[in-house]
Amino acid sequence: KLCKTYEEARDLCDEAQNDERIAIIGGGYIGVELAEGYNKSDHEVILFHKKETLLDRHIEPEIADKITNLLEDKGIQVKTGTIVKSFEDGANDTLIVKTADEAFEVDMAVICTGLLPQADLLQGKVDQLTNGAIVVNDYMETSNPDIFAAGDAASVKHNGLQTDVYMPLASQAVRQGALAGINVLDKRLRSIGTQSTTGMLIFGRTLACSGVTLAMALDAGINATKVAYKGSYRPDFMPNAHKVEIELVYDRNSRKVLGVQLWSKHDVSQAADTISALMHYHGTIDELSFVDMLFSPNFDQPFNYLNLVGQLAVKQENGYLRT
């Protein structure tokens, strides 16, 4: 079974009602969220991912390990660094999922290994990335000004990497579709690119991300490093002062913030949006460390957790936390 659309997800839920053991191939957002869903419906779940850590395009290994541990604590088998080689028919309408070293008998397998752009119609007619994604300018025009493209078929400018990338996200598709409609008759509004801001709620924990990981920054030739923060999101005398864990990636030369990932039982999703806006305007760790943010014991510490992770980055570079 494939899982790409809402309707396909509903069909998968309906068809799994009489199944017991389900394999999920692909440990991105869809795979992890499906693993949670099937676990909550009392299925035995095995999650396969070819990379060494889950959600490797979005988060640092340290946070990926926490997600893996959470899934395993819930009874989900997580097989990272594992490539599914083949599927074979098993006894009693079961399916055998084969890797290089093992075989797993399941009732159903769900494949959610990512998207490829469906752009064959324009192959050879417009500029495309190596994976086939249609290259568009800031107005959603292709190299043929009479043809516009948007969403999962189109590229997008990644502001952190300063290059066109393939980033099939619903939020990006909505923005590109709106821009294409606005600009189809006249160039009225430009795209301002993306920081690739994403998030999910998994077993009561919030994961929120924006920008690049350290590995992505280093691969792009940026002199980058990262800093980690862990602390209560609000004063400990308040009830449910949940811990917030943050990984912050920044450029050591320019001191610009390049990426952030947050993990908490508290809803920290809007913090990723805050950092996205900061990165869009080339904000630095110095600015982040003291940027004005509200304080109330109901909401945060006197220094917001985003201030505090910025201050840790400044300390890492300068040798002091704050003066």
Which residue ranges define each predicted feature?
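General small-molecule cofactor/ligand-binding pocket signal
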Residues: 1, 77-79, 148, 225-227
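FAD-site-proximal beta/loop scaffold in flavoenzymes
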Residues: 1-19, 103-179, 278
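Conserved SAM/SAH-binding loop
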Residues: 6, 81-85, 100-101
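Rossmann-like dinucleotide-binding cores of NAD(P)H-dependent redox enzymes
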Residues: 23, 29-86, 169-172, 195-215
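Conserved beta-strand-loop-beta-strand element in the redox core of flavoprotein oxidoreductases
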Residues: 88-103
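Flexible, glycine-rich terminal cap/loop adjacent to redox cofactors
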Residues: 113, 206-210, 220-323
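A short alpha-helix-loop-beta-strand transition element characteristic
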Residues: 128-131, 187-198, 223, 227
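A conserved FAD-binding loop/helix module that cradles the flavin
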Residues: 136, 150-212, 300-320
